[in-house]
Amino acid sequence: MKKLIQSSILLLVLSAGIHSAFAQKYFTKTGSVNFFSKTSLENIDATNKKATCVIDSKTGQIEIALLMKAFEFEKALMQEHFNENYVESDKFPKATFKGNITNITSVNFTKDGSYPVDITGKLTMHGVTKDMKTKGSIVVKSGKINATTEFQVLLADYHIEIPAVVEDKIQKSIKISATLWLEQLAQ
């Protein structure tokens, strides 16, 4: 009987540890990532509303992944050119970011508020991985998390070529912004 009680207590302690480990992670599979480039021809603007993201509130680890073909454009022809000629979505189907929120301890995930964050990591796109640093914001409201960031990407850094015909009419960098509404992972 004593061993049964000890085993039960051990099981409860282990369960509590697992529970708290899961309670540290926030997740979404409907994150919004937008890119924008102002051009003399016309603005290039697309949004992907299917980005997945996990943030570990204890360690600051963050991972984001999205399928390139999920970017939606106002014009179907732009979407076709983007996937076939620029990012070659069949060859390089996804983009990922893996990194850390370096000042995660300044974010109180149990208290409503807006917290500025510093993010470092590696962005992989078009088969190329580059180190990256950016700033962002985490807003905590009623137990939900809204993480946002905005940064510039040089197309040449990721070997994304601009055809000579339109080279002078398209910017060499694009603005990328992300809005991620995350919820605590269920236990």
Question: Positions of the model-derived regions?
Answer:
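Bacterial Sec-dependent N-terminal signal peptides
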Residues: M1-Y26
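Low-complexity, acidic/polar, glycine-enriched regions of mature
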Residues: F22-Q187
